[in-house]
């Protein structure tokens, strides 16, 4: 799916909060597209880079004085009842398929049950994951089946016209745009 169509698709899926995953070549703009959609919709945006996270980053057990252990939820999780996080937004798990199997199990619970350790995520939040394709040999692991089955997967296709539009919108110098349009293979070999 091309970038412009993918942006519109995410916008159309936002009202129903369908969990999606975007896969594509390394550096192809997957996360940037999600950021731009959140900005265009005027909603909150939280991004977590999965290769740098541990299971403990999703909550720590602590005794609460009642002979039971409770979870201290992470500051970034948009759970119901929080006033310091917008009511609507996109929670993006970047490079999700570089996460360990244990982290993917936690993510599956967030995607399926829309909660973390029993605390429900705000109803206005959508979960989007991004990641590289295994065929690109960019460190992508196999995604667990029970996680993959709970999301819609879109593959971002790289097109020169999409890149050119992005470059113009982001102030890339015309000489660079002209050079890349002349030597397109250089752009595609980097992405």
Question: Where are each of the predicted segments found?
Answer:
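AAA+ P-loop NTPase catalytic core and its hallmark functional loops
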Residues: 1-182
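C-terminal helical "lid" subdomain and adjoining coupling/linker elements of P-loop NTPases
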Residues: 189-191
């Amino acid at each position: 799916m091309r970038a412009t169509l993918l942006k519109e698709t995410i916008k159309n899926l936002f009202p129903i909060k369908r969990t999606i995953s975007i896969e594509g070549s390394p550096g192809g703009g997957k996360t940037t597209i999600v950021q731009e959609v959140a900005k265009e919709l005027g909603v909150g945006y939280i991004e977590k880079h999965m290769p740098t996270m541990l299971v403990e980053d999703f909550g720590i057990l602590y005794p609460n004085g009642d002979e039971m252990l409770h979870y201290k939820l992470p500051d970034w999780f948009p759970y119901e009842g929080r006033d310091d996080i917008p009511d609507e937004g996109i929670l993006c798990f970047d490079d999700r398929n570089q996460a360990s199997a244990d982290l993917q199990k936690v993510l599956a619970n967030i995607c399926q049950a829309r909660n973390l350790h029993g605390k429900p995520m705000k109803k206005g939040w959508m979960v989007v994951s991004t990641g590289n394709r295994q065929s690109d040999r960019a460190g992508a692991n196999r995604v667990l089946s029970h996680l993959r089955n709970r999301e819609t997967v879109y593959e971002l296709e790289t097109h020169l016209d999409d890149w050119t539009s992005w470059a113009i919108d982001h102030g890339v110098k015309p000489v660079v745009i002209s050079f890349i349009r002349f030597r397109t293979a250089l752009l595609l070999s980097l992405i």
